[in-house]
Every structure is written in structure tokens, then in C-alpha cells.
């Protein structure tokens, strides 16, 4: 039998599905945070989120919750406010 690298872990199919879902949710949350920190939501960013939500199987409810989280995050709001001056 050939050696596989990296080594495959002893994870069940259910564990793999659970881990994958967690990665998808974290990735979407990270993109939402980054886009919020960049400032205004442009049409291109909205389109990107639409595509990502499809690819990562993000429900409308989850999308709305992530947007609420990001909009109410003081750190992200501060970064967005201050980054407006980076490009002046």
C-alpha cells in the first residue's frame, strides 16, 4: 500500500462532515468580518457574498445573523472608520 502524506486521520464520515461544516461557517464569518472592516458594502461585495453563501451552503438566516454580528462589532466598525483615511 502506498504511503499517503499527509497521514489520513482516523475520523468517521460524520466527524468529517461536522468539521467541514464548522470550517465553512468560520470561513463565511471571516469573510463577512473582513468586508465589514473594509467599509461600505459595494455591489461587487454583495455579489461575492451571494456566491459564497451558495458554495458554503449558508442559509439566509445565518447570513443575516453574521451581518448583524459584524455591523454591531465595535472593533470592525472602528477599523472601517479609520481605514477610510488610508486611501485619502
Task: Give residue ranges: language-model regions.
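Long, charge-rich, low-complexity intrinsically disordered regions
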Residues: 1-14, 88
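Eukaryotic compositionally biased, intrinsically disordered low-complexity regulatory regions enriched
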Residues: 65-88
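Eukaryotic low-complexity, mixed-charge intrinsically disordered interaction/regulatory segments enriched
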Residues: 9-56, 60-72
